[in-house]
């Protein structure tokens, strides 16, 4: 569709074709998301997880396809290395091969569409890597690694993981907290410098809430089991299975 001559095909965007997640998005106020999508008003609609993103765009004009969350992630922060990341992905396209697509793999290019935000660009690469057989947590660790090079107490196996994957993918670096989910995993990863807040609450009633600050979701004090925060370079992960 993108490469067709259909009128206004540049505005065509599929939020998701996933069988495990549904994405609701829009350029609207947070309190309007429920009334806008009628199925969110149905009492029979239930979910075991939710990933919510609320903010105003700062480095791109607000458009529907750039509204977060994206297909696999959202972001609070910015990727300072974006120009280099995009350039390297374009270079990689020259050597990419696929048993599935064969000689038609060039129809996937460019992997990162021009004119997209840092968050949208990162999500496109995450989507590509999910089709290589890697798990979503592994992909996030590849793209946002810990400060591992001079870490004296890190295990050799963990350092080897980062060293190996560093040959495949350079870091997407910057002050950012990046929540992600594929329906089976849900979690968040904080940049190696810890420059964005990420705090979590575990309740006695069996809920787990993570957000940029405490208090986004009301929790009775007597229901709080544990409070905590995500440390620099660390991942917060829940296996829903």
Model region roles, listed by residue range:
Residues 1-241:
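Conserved short alpha-helical segments that host acidic/polar catalytic motifs at enzyme active sites
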